[in-house]
Amino acid sequence: MAAGVSLVSDLPYSTSRESNTDMETVNVRVPTAKYTKVGETLRHVIPGHMQCSMACGGRACKYENPSRWSDKEQAVKGLYSSWITDHLLAMARPSTEIVEKFNIIEQFHVCGLKTVINLQRPGEHASCGSTLEPESGFTYRPELFMEAGIYFYNFGWKDYGVASLTTILDMVKVMSFAMQEGKIAVHCHAGLGRTGVLIACFLVFTSRMSADQAILFVRAKRPNSIQTRGQLLCVREFAQFLVPLRSVFSCAEPKAHEVTLSQYLTRQRHLLHGYEARHMKNMPKIIHLICRLLLDIAENRQTVEEEVLEIPDLTEEVEKTVSLQALQQLGKEMRGKGIPISSPRSPDQPNLLGTPCDPPHDQPLCSDQEFDVLWRWPTVDNTYRSRLILSKCFSYSDSALHKLDPRVHVLQSPQNLSSKSGLNFSELYASQSRLALETPDLLPSDIKSSPKHDLLTGSRSSLVQSKKIEEQVSCPPASVKQAPLKVAKRSMSYGFLGRTNDSSTMFSICQVGRSTNKNSNCDVTQHFKDVPILTLQSELSPETRHLFVAKALTVDLDGEELRSKVSVWQMELNSREGAWERLCNERDPVVLSLLMWSWLEQLKEPVITKDDVETLSGNRLNPEHALNSLDKGQKQTLLCILDCAAHLLKIPEEVENAFFERLIKAFTWISSDSENGQLIYKALKDVMVPVLRDLRTKAMEELEFTCHCSFVP
C-alpha cells in the first residue's frame, strides 16, 4: 500500500564496505524510502481498519477503483497495473467484481499472462475495497484463474514487512520457473511495496543488476514502488546474499572466501532448483558440465534439434523497455545520488573477453558514454542475450520437460581473445596444436599423406570458407549481428549444452607446409586467407578423438597462454551472466580439462584429505566399499570424472597412468615425487583402477546396445 506521503532522504549511503576498482563510488544520497520514519512507525501500531480508512479510502480504496487511474496507469484495463518488463506485470489486487466486470481473465490471455503471484496473507486489508471471499480470504477466488489455465502462487508476506533472504531466493526461483510458461503478474495490496521488492530482487537475481539499479528501474516503471527503509534494505541485502553463492572460483575476481567441497555444494543447492537441483545434489555443476562437454568433443556428437516455443530473455527486455530518454534520466539520477556505476573502459585497457569490433547493435549510445547505461553487458551479444533465459541453467517446468532436453542451444560466444590481450589469431588454438604435434598417431594415415595435411588445430568457433578467414581475424563471429530467430532450438545431444554448427568441429587442417621453426605460426596466419579449410569431423576416427581428449586430461597448467585462457574463464564464471552457456561453446579439451582441475585445486581443502587416503588405503581390496566410505559429494565428484574417462573406452596404458597421476594430484594436492607420494598414489590407484574398468565395461555395453538398436528395422 502507498499513501500520499512526503519524500524524504535517508542518511548518505556509503559503499565503502566494498572496494571495486571498476566502480565509481560517491558518498551521496541513494534511493530513499517513500515514508518518513514516523510514518513507518505509525503503520506498525495503528490498527489495520484505521490505516485503510486514512491511507487509501477504506471501502472506496483508490487502488481497487479503476476510475481513480488513467489509462496509462492501467496496463490491464480495470486494474492499477504497470509493465515492469515485457513479461513482468505489477498490479494492485484484483477482486471478483473487477475480474468479471472488466473481463480480466480474457485480458490476461490476450497479454500472454500465464501466472499470478499473490503476496498477501488471507484476511489482509479486510476493510479495503471489495469484501473478502470467505473461501480464500482474498478479494477473489484463485480458482477463477486456475480454471482458466492460469497458474497461481501465494507467498504470504506481511504488509510493510520484509521476507527472509532464503524465502525471497525461493520466490525468485519459482518466478524463473514460471516465466518459462509465459508472462507473470505479481500483486500484493497496492502492488507497490512487497511487489516492488520481489520484482527488484528478481531483476538482481536474473540480470545481476545492483540493488540500487534494480530499485530505480522498478520505480521508473511503477512510481512509489519499494516504500519502506526495511524494503530498501531487503533488496540490498539480497544482492549481497547472492555474491558468495555465485562465486565458482574463490581465487578469481571477484574474490570470495575459500570453501570446501561440502560448503560449495550447500551454496550450489541454494541457486539450483528443478532438474539441476535433483541431478546435481551431490555434484559440482562445473565438474558435471565439463565432463559432458569433453565427452561431446570425444564423440563429435551431432545435435538433433527440436523446434520449441521461444522463451523470452529478461535482460533483453530491460534494455528494450527503457527508451533513450529514460536511460538518460536514470543515468543522471543515479550519478546525482551516488549510485556506483561502472566506469567506461579506457582505450588502452584490455578487454579479455570482448571483441575487437562491436556490432552496430552493441555500439555504445551517446548516452552510454556519458552515463554508462546500467544494464549494458559489453561482452554479451544482444542476440545471444535474447536466449539466455532459453538456455538458463535454472530448470524447466514439468510441462516443458517432455519436449525439452535440459541441454540447450546457445549462440557462439565471444571467447576468442582479442589482440588487446596479447594473443593473436594463430595462438588461439596453440594448446591443441602442441598436443597434436606430440601425438603423431592422432591422424589416420590417409589424412597424414594428404597434401592438405599440415597443421592440427582445435576449432572452437564456427569454421567458414577461406574467403571469410580474414574477416574472422578482424572480427570474431560472435560479434557479428545474428538475425533474431522466430523459433528457438534446443539441443538433444546427450550432455552437450552448446551449439554445434554443421561446419564446426574440434579439428581443422590447413594447407600449409609443416614447419617446426618459430615462424610457422606467423606463416599460418599470413596465409590463412589463401588456405582452404577441411573439417575433420568425419575423417577422424572415434579412437583418435578419444585419445585426444584423454591426453588433454593429463595436461598440467603450464604456460602464460593457457593460464590466461583459464583465468578468463574463471572470472567469466564468477561475474558474467550467461557464462555457463558460453562455456558450452568452448571446444578446446585442454582448456576445459585445466579449468576442471583448477577448480578442484582452489578449494579450501583437498577433496580427498589425508584421513580419506588412509580410509581408502585400508579398504583398497574392496574398491566399492572404499568409495562408499567417502561422503556423497566426494564420491559423486570422483565418479563423474572416472565415468568421463571410462566413456573414452580403450586408451594406451601410459595415457591412462598419466590420467590417474593428474586425477590423484588434483584430488589430494599431493605430488607423486613428495614424501610417501608413490605409496599414496599406488594405494589410490588400487581403488580407482578397478572402478574405472567397471565403468568402462558398462560404457562399452551401452555402446553395443545403442549400436544394436540403431540397426533394428
Curated annotation (Swiss-Prot):
InterPro entries, per this entry? Answer: Dual-sp_phosphatase_cat-dom, Prot-tyrosine_phosphatase-like, PTP, PTPDC1_PTP, Tyr_Pase_AS, Tyr_Pase_cat, Tyr_Pase_dom, TYR_PHOSPHATASE_DUAL_dom
**Cellular component per GO, a single term:** cytoplasm
Pfam families found in the cross-reference section: DSPc (PF00782)
GO:BP terms for this protein? cilium assembly
Q: Where is the active site?
A: C188
UniProt-listed PANTHER family: TYROSINE SPECIFIC PROTEIN PHOSPHATASE AND DUAL SPECIFICITY PROTEIN PHOSPHATASE
Q: Which family does it belong to?
A: Belongs to the protein-tyrosine phosphatase family. Non-receptor class PTPDC1 subfamily.
Q: What is the name attached to this protein's record?
A: Protein tyrosine phosphatase domain-containing protein 1
In which organism is this protein found?
Danio rerio
The gene designation is ptpdc1
